[in-house]
Amino acid sequence: QIERTREHYRHEMLATDFLLQGALKLLEQVRDKQLRLDRTIEVSVTNAAEKKAIMLRIVPNVRTLQHLLRQNRADYMRSINKKLPMRQRRAAWKNLVIRRNKAVRLVEEMNLRTGKLQPLFEKLRRASNRMIEVRALLADKDSLTQPGMPTVDELNGELHYLMRLTFETPKTLE
């Protein structure tokens, strides 16, 4: 039961393009020998055979992850494009979610240490909280007229920046 809960937590944590991009960067650094394998991936320091097997899997997995995340970027832009019909936008989001799940399975296969992903998750949480704050400010028309408050355009700009950064909307991060 505990292991299943842990797996569910990791899956939920990884199932965003923001964290998948971070996981990809970590795997690229291991592949390029900028980060130590045994400090980034859960593997015994003394298990040379397992280390070798992981290094052989990293190259194709990184290539596949890059491809999936590139496609996700295009589908994300389609899904938030209000000029497209809702049917196309929903189809793009559905494809994005399917690819995210494939990417999560690839990252899980590599067994990255949760401690390496936790800082990224905290950044995502802060971005999510800020999106909620910005939406609340935009909804409160009275506060927008007070001196020193950002303009509607500035707030919308910040919200769109955070959405492009995380490939999420405030609603999808709830």
Regions found by a protein language model. Name each.
Residues 1-174:
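Transcription initiation cofactors for RNA polymerase, centered on bacterial
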